[in-house]
């Protein structure tokens, strides 16, 4: 037993030292950054206004430090929980304590705790209740002098349900199988094997049509499977079209375990080999199949979230079209094409509906209406939403421009999220007298004039620049996308005289209350 048997926190990772090494920066930079994060300072604020404290670390590095800081603190906390749990069972040893201290991932800590974790009733636990654990230990020792035929009868106990020598041997093998399954060394070796040689396979019912037909007879190695395929397989499985599993060469896996357990050639070793084979197929493989797929999903999620963030950043940082009066068209068929004219500052001048596409089109009236608006408000540019009927609307506008006296241009802009914004409380407060569809037209005009200022009003997840966003961990996705929005706003800056409250609240050092107060004071 370790001398350190108190239940005080005995695991204190030198986090500044670890982070300094991981990020190749000075320990004092880490210490100051951690202190600022613990005080509640936001990452954009630290990156821009505390450069002297951090040694001019950029926002992405600070964000990465924040993520790792959280992980390492959780790791220390879990180490202590596991240490305390094993200690309470009076099974702590110096070796186990050292293993816990040396663990660098949560998965390693869980593998160490696995043999001590309270279990539901298992075949092994039932065998132990029947008094067969000593027999299992004898077999595991693999002493050449052990003769099973002589010792097995000693464990027959009718009262406990061990009626024959076969019952005794089977129970002992169940105990050995669970011991093998719970062995951290076994799991570490096999995880490497799964990551190196494992193959992800999926099967589907050829008679069922779906978007997953390419995965109906699919296989690819674990270490080469791209994230988007992981997420596609997960969704196909969730929707009931696919059956997905990981396969590993059985003999290779069993051989790796035997290297750890088998001590030579004898009768007991043969029994242990049989128990190892059972352990792998019944206990280890299902567990590692799940764990490996979870790891693949975690990596795929992180990759998808990063791609989502990169796409969002590009969209938010599209250069604005400044000082232009804009006519926006939100194309449609049956309900017509919604339009809005806004001045160079984004103020709405006029809204309406024209019918230039089937089935209710009247192109002559539509042209006359638009020409009148362009002349009345001295429109400089036309913004067309890229949704339904965009192609027809674009052709109509191109024809219209040729008939105008003044030089005017048009641009097709993304209307992703416009419908979400138009139905939001923010849009209702901004345009209480406008129909939802007309609010969308206003948004399409403004996102051409200043994409960042307009798009910050929309939930980043609704802008539609990422794959499988509904399969992502919601909190992690929101945290990442909020970070991107903050980065963009603070990189570009805002005009205090014109910026909206949603834009101002993204500025480092401001919040919803101060943003609203600024707008109220300005008005």
Where do the language-model regions lie?
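Short, well-structured alpha-helical segments
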Residues: 30-35, 62, 97, 101, ...
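Amphipathic alpha-helical segments within well-ordered protein domains
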Residues: 17-20, 34, 47-50, 66, ...
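Long, highly charged, low-complexity intrinsically disordered interaction regions
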Residues: 3-4, 12-15, 74-91, 101, ...
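N-terminal cofactor/phosphate-binding cores enriched in small/glycine residues
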Residues: 26-60
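Active-site catalytic pocket residues across diverse enzymes, especially alpha/beta-hydrolases
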Residues: 50, 401, 522
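Short, well-ordered loop/turn and helix-capping segments at boundaries between secondary-structure elements
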Residues: 52-55, 141, 182, 450, ...
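Duplex nucleic acid-engaging cores and interfaces of nucleic-acid transaction enzymes
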Residues: 2, 61-64, 71, 75-328, ...
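Generic start-of-chain signal for non-secretory N-termini
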Residues: 1-31, 38
């Amino acid at each position: 037993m370790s001398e350190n048997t108190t239940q005080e926190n005995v695991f204190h990772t030198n986090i500044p030292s670890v982070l300094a090494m991981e990020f190749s920066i000075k320990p004092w930079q880490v210490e100051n950054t951690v202190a600022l994060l613990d005080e509640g300072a936001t990452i954009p604020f630290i990156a821009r206004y505390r450069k002297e404290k951090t040694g001019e670390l950029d926002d992405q590095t600070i964000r990465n430090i924040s993520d790792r800081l959280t992980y390492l603190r959780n790791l220390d906390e879990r180490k202590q929980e596991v240490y305390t749990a094993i200690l309470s069972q009076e099974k702590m040893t110096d070796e186990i304590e050292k293993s816990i201290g040396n663990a660098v991932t949560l998965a390693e800590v869980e593998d160490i705790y696995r043999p001590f974790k309270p279990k539901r009733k298992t075949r092994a636990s039932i065998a132990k209740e029947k008094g067969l654990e000593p027999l299992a230990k004898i077999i595991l020792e693999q002493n050449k002098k052990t003769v099973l035929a002589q010792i097995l009868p000693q464990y027959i106990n009718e009262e406990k349900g061990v009626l024959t020598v076969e019952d005794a041997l089977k129970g002992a093998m169940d105990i050995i199988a669970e011991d093998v399954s719970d062995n951290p060394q076994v799991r570490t070796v096999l995880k490497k094997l799964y990551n190196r040689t494992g193959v992800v396979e999926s099967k589907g019912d050829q008679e069922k049509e779906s978007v997953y037909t390419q995965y109906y007879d699919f296989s690819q190695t674990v270490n080469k499977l791209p994230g988007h395929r992981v997420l596609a397989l997960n969704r196909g499985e969730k929707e009931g079209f696919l059956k997905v599993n990981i396969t590993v060469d059985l003999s290779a896996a069993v051989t790796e375990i035997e290297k750890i357990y088998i001590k030579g050639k004898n009768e007991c070793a043969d029994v242990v080999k049989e128990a190892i084979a059972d352990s792998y197929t019944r206990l280890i493989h299902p567990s590692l199949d799940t764990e490996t797929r979870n790891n693949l999903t975690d990596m795929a999620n992180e990759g998808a979230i990063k791609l989502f963030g990169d796409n969002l950043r590009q969209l938010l940082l599209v250069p604005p079209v400044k000082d232009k009066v804009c006519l926006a068209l939100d194309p449609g068929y049956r309900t017509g094409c919604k339009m809005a004219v806004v001045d160079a500052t984004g103020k709405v001048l006029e809204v309406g509906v024209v019918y230039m596409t089937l089935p209710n089109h009247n192109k002559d009236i539509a042209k006359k209406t638009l020409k009148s608006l362009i002349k009345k408000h001295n429109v400089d540019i036309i913004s067309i939403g890229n949704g339904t009927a965009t192609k027809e609307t674009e052709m109509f506008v191109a024809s219209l421009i040729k008939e105008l006296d003044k030089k005017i241009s048009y641009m097709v802009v993304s209307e992703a999220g416009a419908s979400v914004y138009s139905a939001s409380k923010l849009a209702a407060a901004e345009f209480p007298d406008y129909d939802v569809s007309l609010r969308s037209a206003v948004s399409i005009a403004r996102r051409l004039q200043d994409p960042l200022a307009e798009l910050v009003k929309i939930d980043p997840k609704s802008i539609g620049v990422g794959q499988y966003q509904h399969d992502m961990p919601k909190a992690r996705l929101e945290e990442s996308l909020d970070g991107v929005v903050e980065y963009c706003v603070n990189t570009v800056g805002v005009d205090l005289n014109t910026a909206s409250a949603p834009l101002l609240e993204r500025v480092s050092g401001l919040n919803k209350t101060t943003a609203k107060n600024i707008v109220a004071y300005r008005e």
